[in-house]
Amino acid sequence: RAFLLSLTNATSLGLNSKFVFLENYKYMFRDEYFILALKNTLKLMAVVPIITIAIALVLAFIISQSDLKERGLYRTVFYFPNIISLTVVGIIWSFVFHPTMGILNSFLNGVGLHGWAKSWLGDGSTALWCIAVTLIWQATGYYMVMHIAAMDGISSEIYEAATIDGAGPVRKMFSITLPLIKDIIGITFVLALSGTINLSFTLSKVMTGGGPNG
């Protein structure tokens, strides 16, 4: 039904509508703001899910292979950003990237890199990547927990046999862990892709007001 409506000039009242076929789509792709938004979304989709899942896998492997009593604590700490309201996450990172009071610029100025300090969210070349960093930080813990659950289902005897054969952590991860949980990785990647599309708009509104300098 939604697609059929898109082929008409129907308004919210739905009065006197008629078919215009692909005219709405032609208008949409002639809109420079739509094209810019589409490009930015595609950039985020190409970067955020891959980095998020990669970091989540590494953290999950480290925690699942450790014998630390604090494993539960680490899970909670890394998962915590995912339970915070996305608006709050955006506000927190807006302060991190703030041009005068931000942690990032304060650090750069503190170590003498004054030329690197800038208005991160006010610059079109960096605002998108600030949003990407925020998305990665917010979602990594969620996928880490999912991967830990999958890794904990792998028999410890397989790892013990690999240790006897002289395999190190990296070899174990690439030869044992990743192949055995590849189905879960596929699922989490699709979820990360969907999450990037759904959450990027909210973060861009909160952090930049819809674009650099609002």
Indicate where each model-derived feature is located.
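A structural signal for multi-pass alpha-helical bundles of membrane permease subunits
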Residues: R1-G214
